């Protein structure tokens, strides 16, 4: 994947004469110590990130960690003190005002926690408001606004007013307003945090659907760990203005950078994070290669030699065919039937992307370990009851 948005050694010092803070940072003083000595606030300290085109990149941290400051540095709503912000390789921190406005209009949009809808404007005009300020002709901006409302399922409310909409619907309007100019990059600063839990989940689903239809680069600020795990391709953890760790949810869960990250992720429900492919194992299991010379007798011999009750039948190229047992193979032999007649109706294979939470009932009810397949139906391995319990036990280990 190409790098869409890159941040290199980015700093933001709030206050006059920020060079004083840099001298103290070089001496190893902390953010709090610098504030005590100078009154200067270190908002972001030496942040470096490379965000890929089309990914949802979540930035997390406690209040005061610098996450909202960092996202505003990406479109220069806050001016960086030092460092670079590159969009498609161009350093926007050096752009003159006119060129910066063009970038904001065409390439990057932002959704805030507050809906900030104009009560005297209908939903269509609220969605088109930014384009109106930019001088876009009325017919063009209304068409773009209507297209954006269609994307979030609100086209029938185009002529309604904000007070006629629920909180979740008003936030959809805020999202539509950001989508109206079809940006490549979408910045979302705790955009769903003011919503009720059920509505928040609906908005997360909406964002995932939008991303499936049109791959944008999304930088999403959140303090909600479940939200980050649910929507994020990768997560950055911030603390005291610094980026502490960047990785996929399972990378961070398995290898936290320090005690702060470990504590931050305490209590996470890993059954919604890990998937079948994360815990599937190819051994120990009896694999039967389906070739012209292999029938029930050959398959039965393989199971007996490996002391297995069940076997997993694969075609050339590891394409999964099904599961057989010693009993089903003996029955096929008695009836002089081919190997296909020995295949069991269960367990059915599960997709690699299935979450552990969804796997629980399937694994619990299966007579043997459940096979896992990829999108091409190729065999990846098996998941037994013991393997699933061991994986779920990681949650209690994390929370100890």
From Swiss-Prot:
Subcellular location per the Swiss-Prot or TrEMBL entry: Cell inner membrane
Disruption phenotype: Uptake of glycine betaine and choline is completely abolished in the ousA-ousB double mutant.
Name of the protein: Glycine betaine/choline transport system ATP-binding protein OusV
Residues noted as binding ATP in the record, renumbered to the chain: 61-68
The keyword Repeat appears for this protein: yes
UniProt domain CBS: residue ranges: 280-339, 343-400
Record key words, sorted: Amino-acid transport, ATP-binding, CBS domain, Cell inner membrane, Cell membrane, Membrane, Nucleotide-binding, Repeat, Transport
Reported induction: Induced by increased medium osmolality. Repressed by glycine betaine.
Highest classification ranks of the organism: Bacteria, Pseudomonadati, Pseudomonadota, Gammaproteobacteria, Enterobacterales
């Amino acid at each position: 994947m190409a790098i869409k948005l890159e941040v290199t050694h980015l700093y933001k010092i709030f206050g006059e004469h920020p060079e004083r803070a840099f001298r103290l940072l070089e001496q190893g003083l902390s953010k709090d110590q610098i504030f005590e000595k100078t009154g200067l606030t270190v908002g972001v300290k030496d942040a470096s990130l490379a965000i890929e085109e089309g990914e949802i990149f979540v930035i997390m941290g406690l209040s005061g960690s610098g996450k909202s400051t960092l996202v505003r540095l990406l479109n220069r709503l806050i001016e960086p003190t030092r460092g670079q912000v590159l969009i498609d390789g161009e350093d926007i921190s050096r752009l003159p005002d006119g060129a910066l406005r063009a970038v904001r209009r065409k390439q990057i949009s932002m959704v805030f926690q507050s809906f900030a809808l104009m009560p005297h404007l209908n939903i269509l005009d609220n969605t088109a408001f930014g384009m109106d300020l930019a001088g876009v002709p009325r017919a063009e901006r209304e068409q773009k606004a209507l297209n954006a409302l269609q994307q979030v399922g609100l086209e029938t409310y185009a002529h309604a007013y904000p007070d006629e909409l629920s909180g979740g619907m008003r936030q959809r309007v805020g999202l539509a307003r950001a989508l109206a100019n079809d940006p490549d990059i979408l910045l979302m600063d705790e955009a769903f945090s003011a919503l009720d839990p059920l509505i928040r989940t609906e908005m997360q689903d909406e964002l995932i659907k939008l991303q499936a239809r049109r791959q944008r680069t999304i930088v999403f600020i959140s303090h909600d760990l479940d939200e980050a795990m649910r929507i994020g391709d990768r997560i950055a953890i911030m603390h005291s203005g610094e980026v502490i760790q960047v990785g996929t949810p399972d990378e961070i869960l398995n290898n936290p950078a320090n005690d702060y990250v470990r504590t931050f992720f305490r209590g996470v429900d890993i059954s919604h994070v890990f998937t079948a492919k994360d815990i599937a194992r190819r051994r120990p299991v009896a694999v039967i290669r389906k070739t012209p010379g292999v029938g029930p007798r050959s398959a039965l011999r393989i199971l007996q030699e490996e002391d297995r009750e069940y076997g997993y039948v694969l075609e050339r190229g590891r394409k999964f065919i099904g599961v057989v047992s010693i009993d089903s193979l003996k029955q096929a032999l008695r009836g002089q039937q081919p190997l296909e007649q020995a295949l069991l109706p269960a367990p059915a294979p599960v997709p690699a992307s299935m979450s552990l939470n969804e796997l629980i009932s399937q694994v619990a009810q299966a007579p043997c370990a459940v096979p896992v397949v990829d999108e091409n139906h190729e065999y990846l391995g098996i998941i037994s009851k013991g393997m699933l319990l061991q994986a779920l036990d990681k949650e209690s280990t994390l929370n100890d």
